């Protein structure tokens, strides 16, 4: 009888813990974020391993023999630290993005069965070699006027062949099937010209719809980067340039809603105004100034926005449910906590499969804007009710969740930190579940998730006085490193068993240490 009761309690716990975990939160990391200066620098180990359900590393390229190749000199090193995040969160899935901003190689790759077979075999070997769980195919415009019209059907054929090959490989090796996903455009013109929507969805695990970059400095008028809805204030051609139309268009043409992941940008786009008119649709002379860290005109990361917003005029585009700000000749369209909340409610109402962030490295890692660490991504985590990164053993097992009927009395349903144990938390869901974070993680009350401990001040506070912003190895302890931010000194420990390498500015396994010092 006791065993039966224990099993019933265990099943209840599992069912309670699964509440709110049906949505995906997919976070892209770009391999050029490592080159940004100061607070803009972002490495794989900066990613809280339990904030997102899936992480995507961008990008790998296709060479002239139709095989995958790395893009950056240290990609192979970064792959290790990226995939090592799964050791802190066994539920996490990692994927590799293929393609990107210059996907010309796709043209010849899809052109023949032989080329497609070479590509497919290369993908399988590459993904298995580096320890990813899947890949994300990014081809923004297969229907471009520069491309042959056959590419529309060839993309579907490639998807069909990929699905078959991945199923066969999994069956032969006994390994979990490699996840096959893609990121496709939100433009009606590109969808019509390049995609057999009613066919291609059946072959992929999910599709990220890039619901951003609807407007930017390429326009001669101001417009929001990622509006939720259309507005009568915009030009007629812009009626299609919003999240709601794009997502419904994919769905209404045959893509299942549950396979559709909606894009949320962590950046804004700027314009230089032509006149004193600063309204939506006002004449624009070009891009706004470059960001201090991202360095590209017309484009600011979220952590670059706050200085501008301090004394800017902020207005809400009521029909589109998104804010914009103006100061002098600069017009900025961006997203904030409120617009994310509105968009997530719309996402839930339409029963889409989840959200993806482009990109986590453009979010505010260092709480520069005083809203917490990675505030936009954390907001999505909370709104989608994702609780990743927990130890979910059977009740009664070592390090597993325990039941304490009294702790949640008079508390609302939700997740609470354990005031007596930083690595534990309570899940109040009709019953009380007392859980552990994965090893080396602590519970963060802000994101309601398990994450890395906060950076600690170093006792030698003058260590960074003469040093530029960046990461530095502790010469006396290989598993520690310093972080210099505006001449302030912080230090952190690498995860257990790892050491810090100057070459990649990352924590990694102590292999070939002398080569990377």
Segment roles from a protein language model:
Residues 3-22:
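Cleavable N-terminal signal peptides of Sec/SRP-targeted secreted and luminal proteins
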Residues 19-127, 152-153, 161, 371-396:
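Glycan-recognition patch characteristic of GH18 chitinases/ENGases
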Residues 28, 98, 215-236, 264-346, ...:
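Glycan-binding loop/region signatures in secreted carbohydrate-active enzymes
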Residues 35-49, 113-128, 188-199, 243, ...:
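Short, acidic/polar
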Residues 55, 96, 137, 162, ...:
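Conserved, mostly hydrophobic/aromatic
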Residues 65-76, 142-307:
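Substrate-binding surface in catalytic domains of secreted glycosidases
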Residues 389, 397-517:
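Cysteine-rich, disulfide-bonded extracellular modules and peptides in secreted proteins
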């Amino acid at each position: 009888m006791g065993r039966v009761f224990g099993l019933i309690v265990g099943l209840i716990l599992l069912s309670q813990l699964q509440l709110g975990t049906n949505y995906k939160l997919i976070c892209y990391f770009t391999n050029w974020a490592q080159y940004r200066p100061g607070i803009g620098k972002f490495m794989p180990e900066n990613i809280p391993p339990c904030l997102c359900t899936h992480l995507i590393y961008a990008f790998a390229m296709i060479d002239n023999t139709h095989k995958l190749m790395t893009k950056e000199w240290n990609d192979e090193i970064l792959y290790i630290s990226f995939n090592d995040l799964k050791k802190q969160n066994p539920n996490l899935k990692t994927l590799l993005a293929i393609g990107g901003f210059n996907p010309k190689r796709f043209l010849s790759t899809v052109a023949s069965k032989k080329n497609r077979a070479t590509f497919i075999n290369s993908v399988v070997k590459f993904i298995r070699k580096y320890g990813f769980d899947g890949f994300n195919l990014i081809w923004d415009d297969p229907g471009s006027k520069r491309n042959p019209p056959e590419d529309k059907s060839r993309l579907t054929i490639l998807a069909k062949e990929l699905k078959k090959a991945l199923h066969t490989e999994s069956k032969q090796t006994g390994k979990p099937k490699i996840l096959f996903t893609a990121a496709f455009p939100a433009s009606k013109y590109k969808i019509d010209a390049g995609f057999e929507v009613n066919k291609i969805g059946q072959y992929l695990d999910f599709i990220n719809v890039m619901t951003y970059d609807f407007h930017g400095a390429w326009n001669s008028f101001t417009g929001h980067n990622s509006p939720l809805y259309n507005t009568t204030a915009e030009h007629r051609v812009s009626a299609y340039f919003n999240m709601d139309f794009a997502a419904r268009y994919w769905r209404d043409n045959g893509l299942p809603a549950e396979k559709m992941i909606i894009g949320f940008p962590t950046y804004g786009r700027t314009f230089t105004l032509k006149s004193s008119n600063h309204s939506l649709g006002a004449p624009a002379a070009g891009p706004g100034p470059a960001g201090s860290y991202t360095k590209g005109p017309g484009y600011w990361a979220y952590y670059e926005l706050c200085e501008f917003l301090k004394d800017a005029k902020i207005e809400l585009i009521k029909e589109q449910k998104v804010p914009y700000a103006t100061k002098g000749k600069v017009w900025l369209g961006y997203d904030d906590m409120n617009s994310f909340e509105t968009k997530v409610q719309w996402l839930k109402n339409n029963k889409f499969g989840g959200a993806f962030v482009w990109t986590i490295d453009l979010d505010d890692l260092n709480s520069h804007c005083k809203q917490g660490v990675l505030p936009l991504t954390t907001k999505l985590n909370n709104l989608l009710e994702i609780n990743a990164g927990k130890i979910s053993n059977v009740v009664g097992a070592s390090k597993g969740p325990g039941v304490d009927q009294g702790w949640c009395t008079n508390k609302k349903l939700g997740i609470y930190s354990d005031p007596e144990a930083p690595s534990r938390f309570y899940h109040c869901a009709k019953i009380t579940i007392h859980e552990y974070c994965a090893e080396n993680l602590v519970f963060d009350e802000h994101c309601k998730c398990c994450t890395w401990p906060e950076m600690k001040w170093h006792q030698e506070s003058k260590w960074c006085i003469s040093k530029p912003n960046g990461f530095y190895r502790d010469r006396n302890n290989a598993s520690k490193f310093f972080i210099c931010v505006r001449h302030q000194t912080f230090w952190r420990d690498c995860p257990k068993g790892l050491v810090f390498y100057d070459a990649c500015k990352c924590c990694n396994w102590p292999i070939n240490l002398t080569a990377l010092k």
